[in-house]
Amino acid sequence: MLGASANNLKEVDVRFPLGLMNVVTGVSGSGKSSLLVDVLQRALEKKMLDKRVEVGKHQEIKGYEKLEQLMVIDQEPIGRTPRSNPATYTKVLDPIRDLFGKMNEARRRGFTKRRFSFNAREGRCGACEGQGYHLIEMHFLSDVWVTCDQCKGRRYNRETLAVTFRGQTIADVLDMEITKAVELFESQPRILRILQTLEEVGLGYMKLGQSGNTLSGGEAQRLKLAAELSRRSRGKTLYILDEPTTGLHIDDVARLLKILQRLVDQGNTAIIIAVSYTHLTLPTSND
């Protein structure tokens, strides 16, 4: 990247090696985000994704032709309604629905996997339409989500909840911490692979059906990272992460870096924005 001059940058030239983990550090206001977000990210979004974005001033960006994909793992919410949750975002709900649709009780009742979708009218709670909550508009105050009186937050109707796997309904599964779900689905490889990835990024304490609008920025970011890891990588993807270690314990930071290294080992490139060297174990990255 040549001649980056956005905001307080002054004709900055920088080279990021492909196929490695790169880290950009500096105190607040030093220009990290100007360099990587305003210039690099937006320029690549415009060139690779045809997005209409305002790009920070620069002369030229070379070498991006060798990349096939751009993924920005930021702290923006995964959604603003109870339908957006770890199970739906990582798509682990799909094989879980497959499994419930194959249970003997489901077959006896003529249910298919569709019955276990939030969007299936025949299977969901009719009062809250599968959200488990109702939105109360407060007009001059922030709107409030309150638990559905009819399903008590369980999302599905009584007939759907008659189907169980190892004694657990699909509502029980969504109300289950990821670590517990790993134990429940230990015999189901498709489901287990995604759940273990969520554990690896330090989200084992989170419930599978936890509403996306209750997640912190850091949790949303790690959830997005887990979703990427659970997909089969084709390599040649650039990942940009803005301060992913914020609020993490040192053990969680080490775990996160190992996960990022896995992406790099698959032929991808990572660029991380960090405030300080002390927040990262930099021997795993490219100085």
Predicted regions and their residues:
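Conserved phosphate-binding elements of NTP-dependent enzyme cores
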Residues: M1-L280, S285
